Amino acid sequence: MAGVDKAMVTLSNGVKMPQFGLGVWQSPAGEVTENAVKWALCAGYRHIDTAAIYKNEESVGAGLRASGVPREDVFITTKLWNTEQGYESTLAAFEESRQKLGVDYIDLYLIHWPRGKDILSKEGKKYLDSWRAFEQLYKEKKVRAIGVSNFHIHHLEDVLAMCTVTPMVNQVELHPLNNQADLRAFCDAKQIKVEAWSPLGQGKLLSNPILSAIGAKYNKTAAQVILRWNIQKNLITIPKSVHRERIEENADIFDFELGAEDVMSIDALNTNSRYGPDPDEAQF
């Protein structure tokens, strides 16, 4: 799709990160995920987002190799799962993910959630121990950028109070019903890029009459309107699909621009509603 490979954001360390990517949450390991990654890369995507807990890192790597797109042209994100938080366990988990992906380095490594069943260690919050390991991986150039996922402002403040390397990305649930305005403002002030997971509200927003009406103005679907809204908000966005037609359709958003009134109408849909768990309450 024209333009999808050109849309970039610049992280605080100068690394260019593709603004639009493919998420593979709930994509089953094997041929399904491998094909989805291959189709996305062949359609111009240059950013794939996975995680250790998705159990499909090997399939992502296989899809990358099958696509024929050079490794250096693809931005790969993966994430540390909660049970592996802690300094030494983080280092080991990173290496396991790297080997499963079959790559020499990872572009972006994220702490998946700030809490789990065992949030505390002797030294304090486990995600702070993990962040020290993230900084070590970054200094050793095993990863090009480091960040967090599902962090509220108070979680970020904990990290910022102790870090020597500031998180470059915060990936959170973000869509028109939960636009995270306060968190986005905080992250902007700290030069932390915000990335939207579940940008389509797990598909529940696709029948919204306001979004559908806006789409009709531009001859676009409600999904394309939402994703274009993400782009115009300078958000990184990673819609998920395993269907070739939908993968291509999702990326067909770089040939139009939402008018200011339409952006305001989408902004006004916010009700701070979540489809996923609140990070302060999640117990995985």
Swiss-Prot record:
BP terms from Gene Ontology: prostaglandin biosynthetic process
GO cellular component: cytoplasm
Compartments in which it is found: Cytoplasm
Residues that, per the record, bind substrate: 112
Keyword Hydrolase: no
Coiled-coil positions: none
Catalytic activity: prostaglandin F2alpha + NADP(+) = prostaglandin H2 + NADPH + H(+)
Predominant subcellular localization, coarse grouping: cytoplasm
Active site, UniProt feature: 54 (proton donor)
Superkingdom of the organism of origin: Eukaryota
Record-annotated site: Lowers pKa of active site Tyr: 79
The protein's assembly and partners: Monomer.
Function per UniProt: Catalyzes the NADP-dependent formation of prostaglandin F2-alpha from prostaglandin H2. Also has aldo/ketoreductase activity toward the synthetic substrates 9,10-phenanthrenequinone and p-nitrobenzaldehyde.
Stored PANTHER family: 2,5-DIKETO-D-GLUCONIC ACID REDUCTASE, NADP-DEPENDENT OXIDOREDUCTASE DOMAIN-CONTAINING PROTEIN
Similarity-based family: Belongs to the aldo/keto reductase family.
Record-given protein name: 9,11-endoperoxide prostaglandin H2 reductase
